């Protein structure tokens, strides 16, 4: 994936593509020119690793010529990678006309009348008690239940500063604090503080995402055992989870911000728009 290649070809210090990469004693990688920006050792005869504080003397620092050649190749291939990973419009033939399942909504979540939008509030809602409902985590599931085939849906995240969307196993424990992780049965992407995007791998995978991200396309392919996320603003690829298990049903997952009580941080499921225009079938709920 494009973001994978770029992430693994980037300087640990400046986060740009590596230029004349070098290794420190501990294996830390950075650009040769970034060495001058690293903290000096107390004796002044070496530099400290920003991660582990191991001292590297001048003679310890090794140039990574093979890595430099690899990074050059990755940079040259980036336009092709981005083109290959641009969203295929034909995914939309699998679009699902779903709504939010109110019976799963945690009681601080407000669900719109059309059952497509959700935001968090400090006021507790008076809803019936049921085992399907999340408590205490501010989450809600989509009405669809996926066991096979391909499925696609779109979510407007708008200007929300914090959110998580994706899929989860139907069997997840909803009566405990939710920790988003593949190991826990969640395959999601999300954002914190308007700027830190991450995928729910273990450990988390930080994502390079357009900060103007407004609308996300999600494509679940149970034939290939994968779920992919796309920025619908420019069609670029955000992240793909591979080798997801298919031993039980999946549900669409949504969690709006709960750290901004004075603002309505709304996320919304997009309705299917006039499928007859394309003369193509649309998946039922």
Swiss-Prot record:
Q: Does the keyword GTP-binding apply?
A: no
Q: What's a Gene Ontology MF term here? A: zinc ion binding
Q: Where in the cell is it found?
A: Cytoplasm; Nucleus
Please give the InterPro entries that the UniProt record associates with this protein: B30.2/SPRY (IPR001870), B30.2/SPRY_sf (IPR043136), Butyrophylin_SPRY (IPR003879), ConA-like_dom_sf (IPR013320), PRY (IPR006574), RDM_domain_RFPL (IPR022723), SPRY/PRY_RFPL (IPR037960), SPRY_dom (IPR003877)
Q: What are the UniProt keywords, alphabetically?
A: Cytoplasm, Metal-binding, Nucleus, Zinc, Zinc-finger
Q: Does the keyword Metal-binding apply?
A: yes
**Annotated Gene Ontology cellular component terms:** cytoplasm; female germ cell nucleus
Q: What CDD domains does UniProt report for this protein, alphabetically?
A: SPRY_PRY_RFPL, vRING-HC-C4C4_RFPL
Q: Where is the B30.2/SPRY domain?
A: 78-276
ZnF locations on chain (RING-type): 11-53
Q: Which GO biological process categories is it annotated with?
A: innate immune response; regulation of gene expression
The protein's predominant localisation is cytoplasm
Q: Which Gene3D superfamilies match?
A: 2.60.120.920, Zinc/RING finger domain, C3HC4 (zinc finger) (3.30.40.10)
- Describe, as the record does, how this protein assembles with itself and its partners: Interacts with PSMB1, UBE2A and CCNB1.
Cite the PANTHER family for this sequence. Answer: E3 UBIQUITIN-PROTEIN LIGASE TRIM
Q: What is this protein called?
A: Ret finger protein-like 4A
- Gene (UniProt): Rfpl4a
């Amino acid at each position: 994936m494009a973001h994978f290649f770029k992430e693994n070809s980037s300087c640990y210090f400046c986060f740009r593509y590596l230029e004349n990469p070098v290794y420190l004693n501990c294996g830390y990688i950075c650009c040769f020119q970034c060495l001058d920006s690293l903290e000096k050792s107390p004796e002044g005869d070496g530099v400290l690793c920003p991660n582990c504080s191991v001292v590297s003397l001048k003679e310890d620092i090794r140039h990574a010529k093979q890595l430099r050649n690899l990074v050059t190749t990755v940079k040259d291939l980036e336009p092709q990678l981005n083109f290959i990973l641009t969203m295929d419009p034909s995914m939309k033939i699998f679009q699902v006309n779903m709504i939010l399942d109110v019976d799963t909504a945690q009681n601080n979540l407000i669900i719109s009348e059309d059952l497509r939008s959700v935001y968090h509030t400090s006021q507790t809602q008076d809803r019936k008690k049921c085992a399907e409902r999340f408590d205490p985590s501010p989450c809600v599931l989509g009405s669809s239940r996926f066991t096979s085939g391909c499925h696609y849906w779109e979510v407007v995240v708008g200007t929300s500063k914090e959110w998580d969307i994706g899929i989860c196993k139907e069997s997840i424990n909803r009566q405990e604090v939710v920790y988003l992780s593949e190991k826990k049965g969640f395959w999601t992407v999300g954002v914190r503080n308007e700027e830190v995007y991450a995928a729910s791998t273990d450990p988390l995978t930080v994502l390079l995402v357009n900060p103007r991200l407004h609308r996300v396309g999600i494509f679940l392919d149970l034939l290939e055992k994968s779920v992919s996320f796309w920025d619908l603003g420019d069609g670029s690829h955000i992240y793909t989870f591979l080798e997801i298990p298919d031993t039980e049903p999946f549900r669409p997952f949504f969690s709006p911000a709960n750290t901004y009580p004075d603002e309505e941080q709304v996320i919304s499921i997009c309705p299917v728009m006039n499928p007859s225009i394309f003369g193509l079938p649309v998946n039922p709920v």
